[in-house]
C-alpha cells in the first residue's frame, strides 16, 4: 500500500530566493507559529544544502518530517508525530 497523500491546511513556506543564512529563522518562525496546523509544507527546490538546513532546524525542534513524495522531491513536509 502506498503513502497517504498529505493535505496541507496552511500555505507553504517557499524558500526560493532565500539565502541559506536566512533559513533557520524563517523555518523556526513558520513551523512554531503554525504547528497546530500540521502537516506543513516547506518548498526547498532541489538544493540539497537548503533541504539539509531545513531538516537540521526541524530536528532541533523535535519535528518529524518527510522529504517530498514520489513525484516531487522539492519540498519537506513537517508531520505530526
Task: State where each predicted segment sits.
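Long, charged, low-complexity intrinsically disordered regions
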Residues: 1-81
Amino acid at each position: 500500500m502506498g503513502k497517504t497523500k498529505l493535505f496541507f491546511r496552511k500555505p507553504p513556506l517557499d524558500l526560493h530566493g532565500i539565502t541559506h543564512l536566512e533559513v533557520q529563522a524563517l523555518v523556526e518562525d513558520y513551523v512554531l507559529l503554525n504547528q497546530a496546523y500540521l502537516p506543513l509544507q516547506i518548498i526547498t527546490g532541489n538544493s540539497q544544502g537548503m533541504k539539509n538546513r531545513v531538516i537540521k532546524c526541524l530536528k532541533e525542534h523535535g519535528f518529524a518530517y518527510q522529504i517530498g513524495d514520489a513525484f516531487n522531491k522539492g519540498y519537506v513536509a513537517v508531520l505530526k508525530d
